[in-house]
Amino acid sequence: IREAQGKGLIDKAPSFTSTFRYLENSDLTPILKALIEQSASPLQSVEANFAADSSGFATSVYDRWFDHKYGKMRSEAKWIKAHVMCGVTTNIVTSAEVTATETADAPQLPALLERTTQRFDVREVLADKAYSSIRNLHIIDAVGAKPYIPFKSNATGNGHGHKVDGLWNYMLAYYNFNRGEFLTHYHKRSNVESTFSMIKAKFGASVRAKTPVAQINEVLCKILCHNIC
């Protein structure tokens, strides 16, 4: 910023704390999400297969508690979790959500997929077992895409205690009896892990912000920078 001021590109260099003050504004969150989605748009003609996953970012805020067993205070850094959907060809993030670390992955998939389908023709959705549910299978099928989500070891034809579901049973049979073909598609899911590795390698695996809103916005900024860099 000081360099930009020296070159006459801006009249006044703002305080280095200005960015952190803006990050604390909750109105910035939907704007950052929209920018992430818009920045992915130029790759509409390239991406058709998408992977979903989540990853944690460490904060500088700590939980502290007294350990009665050992008679001393203990502390542990709090984490926040980024949920993303990305194209498996270019690693572009097409939608993102940031939540508390204990938030489950499966309920995040519908919104990630819905926002991705606003700009992309989705043909395949890849995700790990954490996303396995009847609801997610039907949501993916409803947009004309095929789900490649492995089943948990205790999965049965009755859909985890629910009434018999045709799509669940079809995909379970496909997974069990066409495992090789399933895996040729599913292996592309590893690209979402590569996406998180790229983001953390370039922009850091932790956040400096102290407040929850600012932490969410800081992670969204990392994802946005990944898309445009």
Where are these regions (language model features)?
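DNA-recognition alpha helix
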Residues: 1-9
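Residue-level detection of the helix-turn-helix DNA-binding "recognition helix"
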Residues: 2, 24, 28, 229
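Polybasic low-complexity intrinsically disordered regions
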Residues: 12, 16-144, 223
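Residue-level "edge-of-site" marker
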Residues: 17, 153, 213
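Catalytic-loop motifs flanking and including active-site residues across diverse enzymes
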Residues: 108, 191, 195, 220
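Helix-centered, glycine/charged polyanion-binding patches within enzymatic domains
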Residues: 130, 134-201
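Charge-patterned, long linear interaction tracts outside catalytic cores
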Residues: 198-229
